[in-house]
Swiss-Prot record:
Microtubule inner protein component of sperm flagellar doublet microtubules. Interacts with HSP90; this interaction stabilizes and activates TSSK6. Interacts with the heat shock proteins HSPCB, HSPA8 and HSPA1A. These interactions appear to be required for TSSK6 kinase activity. Interacts with TSACC; this interaction is direct and recruits TSACC to HSP90, which is essential for kinase activity. Pfam families: Pkinase. Residues 12-267 form the Protein kinase domain. Serine/threonine-protein kinase component of the sperm flagellar doublet microtubules. May act as a regulator of sperm motility by mediating phosphorylation of sperm doublet microtubule proteins. Plays a role in DNA condensation during postmeiotic chromatin remodeling and histone-to-protamine transition during spermatogenesis. InterPro entries: Kinase-like_dom_sf, Prot_kinase_dom, Protein_kinase_ATP_BS, Ser/Thr_kinase_AS, TSSK6_STKc. This is Testis-specific serine/threonine-protein kinase 6. It catalyses: L-seryl-[protein] + ATP = O-phospho-L-seryl-[protein] + ADP + H(+); L-threonyl-[protein] + ATP = O-phospho-L-threonyl-[protein] + ADP + H(+). GO terms for biological process: flagellated sperm motility; peptidyl-serine phosphorylation; protein phosphorylation; sperm DNA condensation. It is found in: Cytoplasm, Cytoskeleton, Flagellum axoneme; Nucleus. The lineage of its organism: Eukaryota, Metazoa, Chordata, Craniata, Vertebrata.
Amino acid sequence: MSGDKLLSELGYKLGRTIGEGSYSKVKVATSKKYKGTVAIKVVDRRRAPPDFVNKFLPRELSILRGVRHPHIVHVFEFIEVCNGKLYIVMEAAATDLLQAVQRNGRIPGSQARELFSQIAGAVRYLHDHHLVHRDLKCENVLLSPDERRVKITDFGFGRQAHGYPDLSTTYCGSAAYASPEVLLGIPYDPKKYDVWSLGVVLYVMVTGCMPFDDSDIAGLPRRQKRGVLYPDGLELSERCKSLIAELLQFSPSARPSAGQVARNGWLRAGDSG
């Protein structure tokens, strides 16, 4: 039986494709069982290289089966088909953080603090459970229709991590969100990589632009070492700027832990920027 026919028999009606990767695509669908809209990630293991099938995909599935957090995407079920396809049925989202930034120009201070607090809390949960994401970026942060609640998604580069000296060597994620040590090919602490990526996400949220020009990847670490600049005329609190500076420390050991980020004073502050 084909995968699409099986899904139909299980009460799913597939809709349009809303995302596509090298070996997978994400489709929106309606579900009789879950009485509403869901997202279904379709993974074609026949087209994927052995490294993906034997290493990265099992890690992703293990994480998705084990995590339970209000700000991490929830998976309803996994459907395996004999033709090599795997269907991952999960929560659907109205939009993502990148689309919200592009639509609004930037995220206002109080809303940015609310959303970033949720993101930081989810990353803290992962790290407390010895898990890392390694591909945190605005398009992997899903948003509710009112743009007040987040869900972190896409654990394709996720893995277990127990901290130093349990270092990673795989280049993961997008260059624009990658930390200096990852770009330089140095064995890295993946938790500190996640923290760097949090800094990039926060900068994008509050400014509407990337902190570093990534058109020349070879020169990117040099620009990262110089630190960030802010657009002229941008109103942003010093507490927020200070948090961004902490997250984007060139030296991994100088960056805070995810737990320290979640407790940062700006996230509890009453100022608007």
